[in-house]
A protein has these predicted regions:
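Conserved phosphate/anionic-ligand binding catalytic regions in large, soluble enzymes, centered on
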Residues: 189-203, 281-292
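N-terminal loops that bind phosphate or other acidic moieties
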Residues: 121, 160-162, 166, 176-181, ...
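A structural-propensity feature for long, helix-poor, extended segments
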Residues: 234, 238-254
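A long, hydrophobic alpha-helical segment
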Residues: 169-189
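Long, charge-rich alpha-helical interaction segments
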Residues: 221-225
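Phosphate/adenylate-binding glycine loop and adjacent helical scaffold
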Residues: 1-146, 152-169, 188-193, 236, ...
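Acidic, carboxylate-rich catalytic segments that either coordinate divalent cations
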Residues: 249-254, 259, 263-302
Length: 302
């Protein structure tokens, strides 16, 4: 496979600079404040991402690392040449890649979800998702050697815990501008509030029956007005979510919930994939997804 390019990535040439090299991605910063993420794995696809395939990624990663290497601090010309080589390799990978746009499939799933015609279908989906979340988190605790089955919220400094972020998140629920107030809120390169909103919009689009990008129009407008409050990674994630293009792991969650042939094991697999995304990004997005299914006032504890 020649690779994949997100549907919101404009064709090169880009007036971009290398912004960072991470364990699973190389980031390009565009003049408009958005990031193009060159991802190591196909599962990391997003609206503004490029997956070049394993061999091309290795070349891009090596060139980008050379461009940022401390060993080249005394040779800025060599570092600049390495960065230019990385960008050239990324542009070549874009040219070879196939478009990735999940919106047609998400629209089918949204219509199918609505056509199921059951009152309370979102709540039933939430029950299935909570059960899958319990199974996935129990399996994760077992892998990490936790035998007591506790969730460890006492030491959890995420938006679910009882630390500063968790307490602030609970307080924000009482605000008139919630959940738009979550833009840029919380820990992470992509702030936790942005992940939560991406999950929320994804589920709202699913349950609307109209497909991606239509639900919660007022909230979407509020988010647009607040994009300058978050990081480049957060803006990029939310730009995709606003356009109805959630990250691939959320697309898999929709597929597992709305595809009639998908069973509980497939849903657990999708949840496990989500939980593996970032330090807490996937879990934060699942929280937002559940909140859209249940209503903002409902608890999202698994």
């Amino acid at each position: 496979m020649p690779g994949l390019k997100g549907c919101l990535v404009a064709p090169p040439p880009w007036e971009a600079k290398l912004a960072g090299v991470f364990s699973k991605a190389v980031a390009l910063l565009l003049p408009n404040g958005l990031l193009i993420s060159v991802v190591r794995d196909e599962g990391g696809m997003e609206a503004l991402a490029l997956w070049p395939g394993a061999e091309a990624y290795a070349r891009i990663d090596a060139a980008a690392m050379a461009g940022f290497s401390d060993a080249r601090a005394d040779s800025p010309g060599a570092a600049e040449a390495a960065r230019s080589a990385a960008i050239a390799a990324i542009e070549a990978a874009y040219a070879a890649a196939e478009p990735w746009d999940p919106r047609p499939r998400l629209a089918e799933l949204s219509r199918a979800f609505a056509a199921a015609g059951r009152d309370g279908a979102p709540a039933a989906a939430a029950d299935r998702l909570r059960a899958a979340l319990r199974r996935a988190e129990a399996a994760d605790r077992h892998r990490r050697g936790g035998a007591d089955g506790t969730d460890g919220t006492a030491d959890d400094d995420t938006i679910r815990g009882n630390g500063p972020y968790g307490r602030a998140f609970e307080a924000m629920k009482a605000r008139d501008d919630f959940p738009a107030a979550l833009v840029g809120f919380g820990p992470g390169t992509t702030p936790a509030g942005d992940d939560w909103l991406a999950g929320y919009l994804c589920a709202a689009d699913l349950t609307s029956g109209r497909g991606p990008g239509y639900a919660e129009a007022a909230l979407r407008n509020e988010i647009v007005c607040r994009l300058d409050r978050t990081t480049a990674a957060g803006r990029s994630l939310l730009t995709g979510a606003l356009a109805g293009v959630p990250p691939r792991y959320l697309c898999a969650l929709v597929e597992a919930l709305a595809e009639p042939c998908a069973g509980d094991d497939e849903l657990v697999d999708a949840v496990e994939s989500a939980l593996s995304h970032g330090a807490s990004s996937g879990r934060d997005a699942v929280d937002g997804f559940l909140s859209a299914l249940l209503g903002l006032g409902a608890t999202v504890e698994a």
